Amino acid sequence: MEDEVVRIAKKMDKMVQKKNAAGALDLLKELKNIPMTLELLQSTRIGMSVNALRKQSTDEEVTSLAKSLIKSWKKLLDGPSTDKDPEEKKKEPAISSQNSPEAREESSSSSNVSSRKDETNARDTYVSSFPRAPSTSDSVRLKCREMLAAALRTGDDYVAIGADEEELGSQIEEAIYQEIRNTDMKYKNRVRSRISNLKDAKNPNLRKNVLCGNIPPDLFARMTAEEMASDELKEMRKNLTKEAIREHQMAKTGGTQTDLFTCGKCKKKNCTYTQVQTRSADEPMTTFVVCNECGNRWKFC
């Protein structure tokens, strides 16, 4: 029974990721015929999958059936406790304190992550367990929290990971605010840089690491642009630094003056060149040329 529910949940998650809900109604009908239990709800996180599908779908029949299922499962969550075992009774108060079916499903899946044996070492299904961010009535801070949550939703990774992107966005904003202590330009620039890096299509690993909890909200709030950069950009910066050091060393050691090269900028032939072995020994040396007239630099192999 659990395997069947997990299979359906995975299919729904893929539909949400691809934004293609074809066949969703059939899956919901399958779920309707499965006798659901509180244990199944908590171990499979099917509630989150159905709720994500409901939010994205524009098909009235799909949204209606999804709401109906969530409503029926809600009865399992806050139903009578006479038949529940002690473990389920412990879970009940935390679950039933939520205000909506969606929140109950998210809370149920979040609290259950630490107890699931098969998720002990699975980072891709990690749900952050940091203290909830304090609420705020500041309109600027609320807007920043919304924008951070939206950035975390880029690519729909949060669905597969099972993260609460809204709470995570609030935690990041709270950490930024606690450090800066106001909502001035420094605060706004800090938030803006987090959003830009989270939405960077060339740096999806940063977003995934934040969603998985590998990068905690308070650490992410303090990271520099260099620390948030993609591996590709870090490598590029490393190479540029090496190049700058090499050129600086060349300038100090000098070179050989020649009129064999024509400057592409000023067309003069008053140049100085230096040859350096920048690659393996069996490769041609790299020639660095500096125009003594205008300072233009170029290189060739």
Swiss-Prot record:
Crosslinked positions (Glycyl lysine isopeptide (Lys-Gly) (interchain with G-Cter in ubiquitin)): 55
Keywords on record: Acetylation, DNA-binding, Isopeptide bond, Metal-binding, Nucleus, Phosphoprotein, Transcription, Transcription regulation, Ubl conjugation, Zinc, Zinc-finger
Stretches assigned to the TFIIS N-terminal domain: 3-80
In-chain residues carrying the UniProt-annotated modification N-acetylmethionine: 1
Compositional bias annotation for Basic and acidic residues: 76-93
A single BP term in Gene Ontology: positive regulation of DNA-templated transcription
Annotated zinc fingers (TFIIS-type), start-end: 259-299
Modification sites for Phosphoserine: 57, 81, 97, 100
MF annotations from Gene Ontology: DNA binding; zinc ion binding
Region (Disordered) location: 76-139
Compartments it resides in: Nucleus
Sites where the protein binds Zn(2+): 263, 266, 291, 294
Matching Pfam families: Med26, TFIIS_M, Zn_ribbon_TFIIS
Superkingdom in the source lineage: Eukaryota
Major localization listed first in the record, in broad terms: nucleus
Ranges of residues in domain TFIIS central: 140-256
GO cellular component, one term: transcription factor TFIID complex
Subunit structure, as described in the record: Interacts with EAF2. Associates with UBR5 and forms a transcription regulatory complex made of CDK9, Pol II, UBR5 and TCEA1/TFIIS. Part of TBP-based Pol II pre-initiation complex (PIC), in which Pol II core assembles with general transcription factors and other specific initiation factors including GTF2E1, GTF2E2, GTF2F1, GTF2F2, TCEA1, ERCC2, ERCC3, GTF2H2, GTF2H3, GTF2H4, GTF2H5, GTF2A1, GTF2A2, GTF2B and TBP; this large multi-subunit PIC complex mediates DNA unwinding and targets Pol II core to the transcription start site where the first phosphodiester bond forms.
Sequence similarity: Belongs to the TFS-II family.
Function: Necessary for efficient RNA polymerase II transcription elongation past template-encoded arresting sites. The arresting sites in DNA have the property of trapping a certain fraction of elongating RNA polymerases that pass through, resulting in locked ternary complexes. Cleavage of the nascent transcript by S-II allows the resumption of elongation from the new 3'-terminus.
Further facts: S-II binds to RNA-polymerase II in the absence of transcription.
The protein's name: Transcription elongation factor A protein 1
Organism expressing this protein natively: Mus musculus
Origin organism lineage: Eukaryota, Metazoa, Chordata, Craniata, Vertebrata
